[in-house]
């Protein structure tokens, strides 16, 4: 197309291989991340068809969803989890795919280690059999989750049929107030849009508040794009992006680096480019957020009350609210700050990076977890764990009564030993609060790392803006 183009349109146009008659365009894929849960059948399909992995140099695997976060890590008690992990090891060895296994210092959550290792780069198309692949869009990449059959397709061809999504601009002006984080921004946006407000769109986040975010904060924001229904979320690369990538293990070096930066600097939305939809948000209006229901759009500020379903005139929404309140065992009008928690989970591909752990450690330093609370911290990768231990953050957490774990997806989802018991209520830094997400009958409230840390100490949700740091 001619004329001003959006960042997404620039990436899309350079990756379309061909457009078959009456078929979706064929998109070339620059990076394919693989994990143990959505890959076994895909590799089986390759084997049955006698095919190879087309580009093993563009494919990287890790174990994260099912892995234990306690020692000994190599003892996997769940039979299904053990079979999936063993299958990934067998398949990676057979097909020549690099694997960051449990014994590797590079192991971690797939959406944490990709950027951490310098594998995620601006302008790329990136896929993984996981919905939160949108995380990598923080680097100015078109990154999206795919299903198992599509995993097989990419393994075999390094391409994927894809219909072109619509575009949405979310411009966040101003400055985030003290105590308000990228997680609060993400939840605030989803609360405004709803969980289907961005369906069929790729979101580009822009504005002064976005430019002020660190790369780790940008990853948190893009990670949760899918929770608003978006296909992907992305942020144009800038000097903050380049500084993060520079000198990472797999990042370009020397002349290739200089060439890369020059190309990446052009990856921005042209002035006058048109979006299918635009949303404008004033960062100054945001407050720390807490979800109260069973999807991320059921969210209010920490100083608000649990909403009353009777206040809405929409029958479907009222019924949804009523069901959520029943499941969450909450009453309308209850102040959020009076909701007590049993568990606190700091981790996940949303909030398990070093900045997240630093923020939480700052809150708990000098305090101790409430007697009624069981709290745990799960670093997003072994490298983050090592960095945190180098900084003494593990001691801060342990002294405060937190469990300090090995890396993995952990309590984000009920696919490993880290789950809630029925009826337990958890302040979680993860991205989904669906019924049973953290274990059958478990009740999940999504918050930022600092808010989760404060809840662990007080035993209930607490406005982090009023916290007395020691």
UniProtKB/Swiss-Prot annotation:
Keywords: 4Fe-4S, Amino-acid biosynthesis, Branched-chain amino acid biosynthesis, Iron, Iron-sulfur, Leucine biosynthesis, Lyase, Metal-binding
Entry's EC annotation: 4.2.1.33
InterPro entries: 3-IsopropMal_deHydase_lsu, Acnase/IPM_dHydase_lsu_aba_1/3, Acoase/IPM_deHydtase_lsu_aba, Aconitase_4Fe-4S_BS, Aconitase_4Fe-4S_dom, IPM_dehydratase_rel_enz, IPMI_cat
Entry's Gene Ontology molecular function annotations: 3-isopropylmalate dehydratase activity; 4 iron, 4 sulfur cluster binding; metal ion binding
GO terms of biological process kind: L-leucine biosynthetic process
Cofactor, free-text remark: Binds 1 [4Fe-4S] cluster per subunit.
A Pfam cross-reference name: Aconitase
CDD domains: IPMI (cd01583)
Catalytic activity: (2R,3S)-3-isopropylmalate = (2S)-2-isopropylmalate
Cofactor requirement: [4Fe-4S] cluster
Associated pathway: Amino-acid biosynthesis; L-leucine biosynthesis; L-leucine from 3-methyl-2-oxobutanoate: step 2/4
Top-level taxon in the UniProt lineage: Bacteria
Binding site for [4Fe-4S] cluster: 349, 409, 412
Subunit structure: Heterodimer of LeuC and LeuD.
Protein's job: Catalyzes the isomerization between 2-isopropylmalate and 3-isopropylmalate, via the formation of 2-isopropylmaleate.
Similarity comment text for this entry: Belongs to the aconitase/IPM isomerase family. LeuC type 1 subfamily.
Protein name per its UniProtKB record: 3-isopropylmalate dehydratase large subunit
Gene name of this polypeptide: leuC
